[in-house]
Amino acid sequence: MALEVPDATENAPCPLCGGSTGLVVGEKGRFGMPVRNLCCATCATVYITPRPTAAAMGEYYRSTYRKHYGGVGYLGADGKTIAVGQDGYEQALVRWHQQQANNALTLVTLTDGAKVLEVGCRSGQTLKLIQERYAIQAFGIEPGEDEAEQARQAGVACFTGALEDFEPGERRFDHVQWFHVLEHVHEPLAALLKLRSLLEPSGTLLVEVPNVYQPYGLLEENFFQNVHLVSYSPNTLPALLRRAGFDVTRVIDDGSLFVVATPRALAAGASLPAPYGRELLSMPEQDADWVAARLRTYATLEKLQLLFKHRGPSPELTSALVSALDFPAFPGHLAEACAFFVEQLLARGMLDDALQVTLAVAQGPHPLELRHQFRNFAERLGAPPEARDAV
């Protein structure tokens, strides 16, 4: 039976540059839902269009969203996902909040008395964990009434509602943190402008989002989701923050994408948002073709790993893998995936296939360090000099 999805949609411009053309990098999302992701031809932002309207998405969150995503759960100590109702779920949830608190404490400097606001604070547990280290003044914004009340019971001054409706009067915050919310927001630039207005001039903003340069699981069947309206990269999220009047001080490209920023002092007569220009991109060479090519390779490698796990090795699979390695890839994922294939092939005594894989990486359009790493690996496996010397 088809899953219920938001039924009212709209064509969306690129949230960073306002463009409307690009390369399609996905046609579906998790649970088989129709989700069309476009990589913008101008700035390489990956975003959904057409997308659900804000009203339709709001109704979806209030109705069937939890039916679809409520069972996703959190990682246990063994790295396996524990869903709601399973043994160990509460411990996994605590571990998740602890990780968020650790990230905040590691990436920003907090002091006793600091006014800290978390947007999408849920039950307030991350803020409470931070309070165990520093005597912060904890504030939250949470649209869910039940979770907002839990946050208040935990001692967090929590506003029930959306960011755009939050009005703190004259109060300004020393730190604002936003964990895995921005990707859900219809108008991210407006939201960041709002957050800038809530910060002290010396305040910090910490944003965490899924990282499109480091996806997880199958690309269309898992990473892309109907509720993730934008898939940010280390190139595009900092540029969006710069448009909103922030100076980006740290970018952590490690699994999730973390960005730390502070309000930028504006020149006389300057207004926000700043106009888009390619100078906002720290890596302008990472254009739509660059991103789309690597997402294609990522998707292929993930599907081949799944086939290998379910059906085992075959000449056809090795041939498909070697062909895929002739295209650009995200280096970390490429190294991890190929290490898996080589290890599994060697365990089955399939030395020739393992050599094909190592040499394909060594001879492919990949970073020099990675190519040399696999060239050395091929040498240890006994590749003939003429094959190694082709690198």
Q: What kind of region is each of these model predictions?
A:
Residues M1-F179, L189-L192, D253-L257, G269-S314, ...:
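Conserved N-terminal segment of class I S-adenosyl-L-methionine
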Residues P15-G22, P234-V251:
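A SAM-dependent methyltransferase catalytic signature shared across enzymes that methylate proteins
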Residues L189-T204:
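A short glycine-rich, Lys/Arg-flanked "PGG" loop and its adjoining helix->strand segment in the class I
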Residues V207-R242:
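Short, glycine-/aromatic-enriched active-site segment of Class I SAM-dependent methyltransferases
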Residues E379-V391:
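Alpha-helical linker/edge segments of TPR/alpha-solenoid repeat scaffolds
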